[in-house]
């Protein structure tokens, strides 16, 4: 069965299926995030209305949320009770749905470049990747309030390399990489490569947990630098309890 969902006024950049498989969230460049019904009568004979109160016909919107810029990413929590969507204005919005259908929304602004992909590790933690070239971690406290926690990829504090140990070939390669990946005229010093795993914007981030698991402790990111990086969260120096893992 193939059907068209109408109502978007510009490009749809990302979509995310609700865990129940009956609701779709969309991220659109018309500054809107929409939650729409994807119930197909010929297929879904007994649709579960939770947590949206009632079951609506295919294509009808349950909710429409506004953002201060293009909506660049969207994701559902494992339980399906939390929706996260990111804006080009360096904000992430967290929408909480309770079983009665009531909705509450929180906006988190962060002083970094915007993200273009989101994934939940648990109902208490979400990771975003984008133009900062470094995955960003956001967590919820015991009262359900979200905030920015840290970058996932933190700079190593190991011993510095000697400046004179870098060959002229390595210096030339570093300068070329700086020009092509970041638009810089120089690399900021011979041999001073980026310390992050990615050298350009992250375009997608995916959880690598088992289907149906309430948590995910492993994820992958891919970027415009041509790299695919696998992250084992327990091996990083990060508070696992804060992540709900």
Stretches found by the model and what they are:
Residues 1-9, 32-64, 68, 88-105, ...:
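Per-blade loop-tip surfaces of WD-repeat and WD-like beta-propellers in eukaryotic adaptors/scaffolds
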Residues 7-8, 67-68, 111, 152-155, ...:
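Conserved GH/AH loop at the N-terminal boundary of individual WD40 repeats
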Residues 10-17, 62-76, 112-120, 199-210:
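Canonical WD40 repeat/beta-propeller blade segments in eukaryotic WD-repeat proteins
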Residues 21, 80, 123-124, 211-216:
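Conserved loop/turn motif of beta-propeller repeat scaffolds
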Residues 27-30, 86-89, 129-131, 222-225:
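Conserved strand-to-loop turn within each blade of WD40 beta-propeller repeats
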Residues 206-241:
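Blade-level signature of beta-propeller repeat domains, shared across WD40, Kelch, NHL, RCC1
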